[in-house]
């Protein structure tokens, strides 16, 4: 059942990432990849602990959401390819900026996601069905 959930949520996550590429794609800067990775960092840090604590969702389904949807939505490989392409185009400053914004931004988004999740958990949020 785990693989089914990962597959279903993975398809949904991949489609959402594709939609973000259509919406934000184009230009010299890989803004769509940056956006999905930062959003994914926040979602993983916020949703997973919150749902694990406050919902009746099974662990298998919860892992399907995290591994499937968020795993397919985010993309380390596109980040790596985008960075190499920027370097090959001679955009060294842009490539370094992209790396720094991705890494530092990802850590900041995880911090915000956890903080927001913890805040809701402390408030005694009701069950999510």
UniProtKB/Swiss-Prot annotation:
Organism: Listeria innocua serovar 6a (strain ATCC BAA-680 / CLIP 11262)
NCBIfam families xref list: crcB, PRK14231.1
Gene: fluC2
Keyword Transmembrane helix found: yes
Binding, Na(+): 71, 74
Recorded GO MF terms: fluoride channel activity; metal ion binding
Activity regulation: Na(+) is not transported, but it plays an essential structural role and its presence is essential for fluoride channel function.
Keywords: Cell membrane, Ion channel, Ion transport, Membrane, Metal-binding, Sodium, Transmembrane, Transmembrane helix, Transport
Location of the protein in the cell: Cell membrane
Signal peptide coordinates: none
GO terms (BP aspect): cellular detoxification of fluoride
Residue ranges that the Swiss-Prot or TrEMBL entry lists as coiled coil: none
InterPro entries linked to this entry: FluC
GO CC annotation terms, alphabetical: plasma membrane
Protein name according to UniProt: Fluoride-specific ion channel FluC 2
Its biological purpose: Fluoride-specific ion channel. Important for reducing fluoride concentration in the cell, thus reducing its toxicity.
């Amino acid at each position: 059942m785990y693989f089914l959930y990962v597959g279903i949520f993975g398809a949904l996550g991949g489609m959402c990432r594709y939609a973000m590429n259509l919406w934000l794609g184009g230009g010299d800067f890989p803004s769509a990849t940056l956006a999905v990775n930062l959003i994914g960092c926040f979602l993983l840090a916020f949703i997973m602990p919150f749902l694990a604590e406050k919902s009746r969702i099974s662990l298998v389904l919860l892992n399907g959401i995290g591994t499937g949807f968020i795993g397919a939505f985010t993309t380390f490989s596109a980040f790596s390819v985008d960075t190499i392409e920027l370097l090959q185009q001679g955009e060294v400053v842009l490539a370094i900026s992209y790396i720094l914004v991705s890494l530092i931004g990802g850590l900041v988004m995880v911090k915000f996601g956890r903080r927001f999740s913890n805040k809701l958990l402390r408030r005694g949020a009701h069950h999510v069905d």
